[in-house]
Amino acid sequence: EACLVGSEMCIRDRCVIPKLLSRNKDENTLVHRTVRTHGMGESFLAEIIKDWEDNLSADEIKLAYLPSPGIVKLRLSLVGKDGKKIVDTLNKHIDLLYEIIPDQVYGYEDDTMEGVVGDLLTAQNASISTAESCTGGAVAKMITSVSGSSNYFEGSVICYSNICKINQLHVQESALHGYGAVSQEVVEQMAIGVKRKLNTDYGLATSGIAGPTGGTAEKPVGTIWLSLIHISEPTRHAS
C-alpha cells in the first residue's frame, strides 16, 4: 500500500473519501470478501484456479491477489445496489473455489493461521507441544500469540545441538549420524519426543538450515523438515 504525503492525505480525506462515501451511499454498495490460502505460491495458485477466475467476470466480480510469505489472500469485490444479492453472489463463488482447493483454504476475512489452529485444537479438546531447531521458538511464539492458547499449548523444547536432541528429545544418535539433523527421520523423532516429554496429543517439530551458512548440495540453505505427530494418526511430514 502506497504511503501518502501530507498534501495528498488532505486531498484524500477532504475530497476523495467523502465523494466515494456519498456515491456508495446514494448509488451502490461495495462489498469485499477475502479468502485466505496457504501452501501454494501465487503463480501456481492462479494457474490452478484460472477457470474459476474466468467465470467471475460473468457476475462482474473483481479479484485481487494479495501475497505475503507463505500466504496468498484472494480478495473478491463486487458493487451493486442489493447488498444481500451481492453477498450471496460472492459466497456462491467462494464455495466453488473451496471445492477446487479445499486443502489450501484455511480461513476467511481476518482469520489467522494461529487462530484457526487454536480453534481446531479447542474444538477437539486437544493439546500440542513443539520441538524447534531452525525456527528457534518462532512456532511457539505464533501459537501463544492467541489469547487463551494456554488451554491447548503445553510448551516447547528448543534444541539446536545434537546433544540436546539426544538428551531432551531422545532422538537416536544413529539417526543423527546416518541421516543428519535436517532429515525426515530426525524431525519425526523430535516430534515424537516432545509429545511424550510434555504429554500432549500433538507433537510438532521443525529442523532445517536457516543460513546464510551451513548449506550443502544435498541440503541447501532454506531446506526445512516439519513433522506432526498425533496419538491416533500416522506421521505427517513435509519438506
Please provide the spans of the model-predicted regions:
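Short glycine-rich anion-binding loops that position phosphate/pyrophosphate groups of nucleotides
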Residues: S7, I71, G208-P212
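Ligand-binding beta-strand-loop-alpha-helix segment within the catalytic cores
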Residues: G180-V194
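Single conserved hydrophobic/aromatic residue that forms the stacking wall/gate
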Residues: E1-G6, I11, I229-S239
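Glycine-rich, small/polar surface segments that engage phosphate groups of diverse ligands
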Residues: S129-V182
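Extended hydrophobic
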Residues: A64, R196, D201-L228, S232
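Gly/His-enriched, cation/cofactor- and phosphate-binding structural elements
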Residues: K73-S127
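Residue-level signal for inorganic ion chemistry
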Residues: L76, E132, I143, L204, ...
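Accessory alpha-helical/coil subdomains and C-terminal extensions
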Residues: E8, R12-G70, R75-S77, K85-L90
